[in-house]
Amino acid sequence: MYDYIKGQLTKITAKYIVVEANGLGYMITVANPYSFTDCVNQQVTIYLHQVIREDAQLLFGFHSEEEKDVFLKLISVSGIGPTTALAIVAVDDNRGLVNAIDNSDIKYLMRFPKIGKKTAQQMVLDLAGKFVEAPKEESSKPPKAKQQGNEQLDEAVEALLALGYKATELKKIRAFFEGTSETAEQYIKSALKMLMKG
């Protein structure tokens, strides 16, 4: 098992990033790949969780140990796999998640992709009281230069699809942001907040 990787960030796609360490490029699935935009061709530390399946070995990556801890707690719940847990972690403010679990807010939990009533109830049962503190965003990144809005919006929608959100939900998001000019990361953060409000 791996705990973290230090290396040069060489590539960003809608689903994963690539970190080169000791001459090997590691494909790492992350919640919001575009949150790493400022780190391309720079040294990064990514906290890892490895999943070994019959047909694949997957690496899931996180900005901080706190974010990884939330992910690990989520995948311990019956009915939540790594992809679903990553989609939940992608929501910028995990305090909402912690409050929903501690207050048995099933409706809020059901807003996450692939979380039905039974799984939401299981989350409350298994995780209530297990989060000491909501994860803090570790980085103090400088504001990003704005790029072409439509291209960035396309990348954001592609990343949200990869997290499991439905195309029908994302049509409304796309229409809302059409004509604006933000980075893909900013679109993703704003879209996740909108999706969680319902």
UniProtKB/Swiss-Prot annotation:
It holds the Pfam family HHH_5. Residues 143-147 are annotated as: Flexible linker. This is Holliday junction branch migration complex subunit RuvA. SMART domains: HhH1 (SM00278). Belongs to the RuvA family. Has three domains with a flexible linker between the domains II and III and assumes an 'L' shape. Domain III is highly mobile and contacts RuvB. GO terms for molecular function: ATP binding; four-way junction DNA binding; four-way junction helicase activity. The RuvA-RuvB-RuvC complex processes Holliday junction (HJ) DNA during genetic recombination and DNA repair, while the RuvA-RuvB complex plays an important role in the rescue of blocked DNA replication forks via replication fork reversal (RFR). RuvA specifically binds to HJ cruciform DNA, conferring on it an open structure. The RuvB hexamer acts as an ATP-dependent pump, pulling dsDNA into and through the RuvAB complex. HJ branch migration allows RuvC to scan DNA until it finds its consensus sequence, where it cleaves and resolves the cruciform DNA. Homotetramer. Forms an RuvA(8)-RuvB(12)-Holliday junction (HJ) complex. HJ DNA is sandwiched between 2 RuvA tetramers; dsDNA enters through RuvA and exits via RuvB. An RuvB hexamer assembles on each DNA strand where it exits the tetramer. Each RuvB hexamer is contacted by two RuvA subunits (via domain III) on 2 adjacent RuvB subunits; this complex drives branch migration. In the full resolvosome a probable DNA-RuvA(4)-RuvB(12)-RuvC(2) complex forms which resolves the HJ. GO terms for biological process: DNA recombination; DNA repair. Residues 64-142 are annotated as: Domain II.
